[in-house]
A protein has these predicted regions:
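Glycine-/small-residue-enriched transmembrane alpha-helix faces in small-molecule transporters
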Residues: 2-61, 104, 108, 164-191, ...
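C-terminal-most transmembrane helix of multi-pass membrane proteins
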Residues: 15-22, 62-64, 232-234, 268-309
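Juxtamembrane helix-loop-helix junctions in multi-pass membrane proteins
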Residues: 38-68, 114, 184-209, 222, ...
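Specific transmembrane alpha-helical segments of multi-pass solute transporters/efflux pumps
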Residues: 38-39, 43-44, 72-122, 158, ...
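Membrane-interface helix-cap regions at the ends of transmembrane helices
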Residues: 42, 46-49, 53, 67-84, ...
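Helix-helix packing/entry segments at the starts of transmembrane helices
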Residues: 61-62, 103, 117-124, 188-211, ...
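Transmembrane alpha-helical segments that form core, pore/gating elements
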Residues: 71, 129-131, 135, 149, ...
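Hydrophobic transmembrane alpha-helices of multi-pass small-molecule transport proteins
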Residues: 71, 92, 132, 141-161, ...
Length: 309
């Protein structure tokens, strides 16, 4: 008897890949990828708020534990089959890259640099994802694709540099490492989601991390939580539920449908969504330069999409 798709994961969450309609799959991939990027855009501002009151290592382990418990409940409730023996190693790579590596390295980096400073490195994430898509996913974008990808990354980095950056070698190194492990985790997860399913990949990766994250989070927990403010708790909830789980459901599905290198270029928009979010929450002014660069980056994303295959 065929397994019925759970209603909770209908719409963009469903496995909708159709080999008979690659154009529809590509469009769905870009839609799912865009939703994922919007969700991820709140990650750095939320992490910045949370790390002011939570120790970075504990924050990383706690968010992974909370998301992992929820992921385990979903897998049990929907009676998902266990991954095959060949799929466990890629799941470990995903867990090390996006469940532990990127959250931990960014949390540590944000002790040294501001969210605006980190835009320089987030601007390199689409390029890193595309490179690992070639190395791990076997993709072969056309040469013009790389031109648009590098140009888009340069625009984002140039805009961030124009805002003024302070010297923080430790923070810079941590952010660079975060981008590399995240790009690997994105590409590996997207490749695996073609056979395992988008939401299943991130759920199993979170479950893989539980035996480490759960006991360590209990060991490193502070003696009391009485001094933690409501914004810090809300930030923890966001990075645990949205950044660690829901965002990846859309993101991995989008990468699998539309191509790792191609859909990965949507990440060029993430810094600007993050700045817009900061402006809305913190009432910071959005400059004309930000608007102009955003338009130019959208053009690079469109160009990359056209020449991705």
């Amino acid at each position: 008897m065929a397994r019925t798709q759970p209603l909770l994961f209908s719409g963009p969450f469903m496995e909708q890949t159709s080999p008979l309609n690659p154009l529809a799959n590509s469009t769905q991939g870009w839609i799912n990828g865009f939703i994922g990027v919007v969700i991820f855009s709140g990650s750095l501002p939320a992490t910045r708020l949370a790390v002011m009151e939570f120790e970075p290592v504990f924050l990383t382990l706690l968010r992974a534990t909370l998301a992992g418990v929820l992921a385990l409940c979903l897998l049990v409730f929907f009676k998902e089959k266990r991954p095959t023996r060949a799929q466990w190693l890629p799941l470990v790579i995903v867990a090390l890259g996006v469940v532990i590596g990127f959250p931990l390295l960014t949390a540590l980096a944000l002790q040294y640099v501001t969210s605006a400073h980190s835009i320089v490195f987030i601007g390199l994430l689409p390029l890193a994802t595309a490179l690992f898509g070639v190395l791990r996913g076997g993709e072969r974008p056309r040469p013009v694709f790389w031109l648009f990808s590098i140009l888009g990354s340069a625009l984002v980095m140039g805009y961030a540099a124009a805002q003024g950056l302070s010297a923080a070698p430790a923070g810079d190194l941590l952010m660079l490492l975060a981008v590399l492990v995240c790009g690997l985790g994105y590409a590996e997860g997207a490749k695996l989601s073609r056979s395992l399913g988008g939401w299943q990949v991130i759920c199993w990766a979170l479950v893989v991390s539980l035996p480490v994250a759960l006991p360590l989070s209990l060991m490193l927990a502070p003696p009391t939580f009485t001094g933690i403010s409501l914004p810090a708790w809300l930030s923890l909830g966001y990075v645990a539920l949205f950044s660690m789980l829901i965002g990846f459901v859309f993101w991995y599905r989008g990468l699998a449908q539309g191509g790792i290198a191609a859909v990965g270029q949507l990440q060029l928009l993430q810094p600007f969504f993050g700045l817009a979010l900061a402006a809305g929450l913190l009432h910071e002014q959005v400059s004309l330069g930000m608007v102009l660069v955003t338009v130019a980056v959208i053009g690079c994303v469109a160009g990359a999409k056209r020449f991705a295959r």
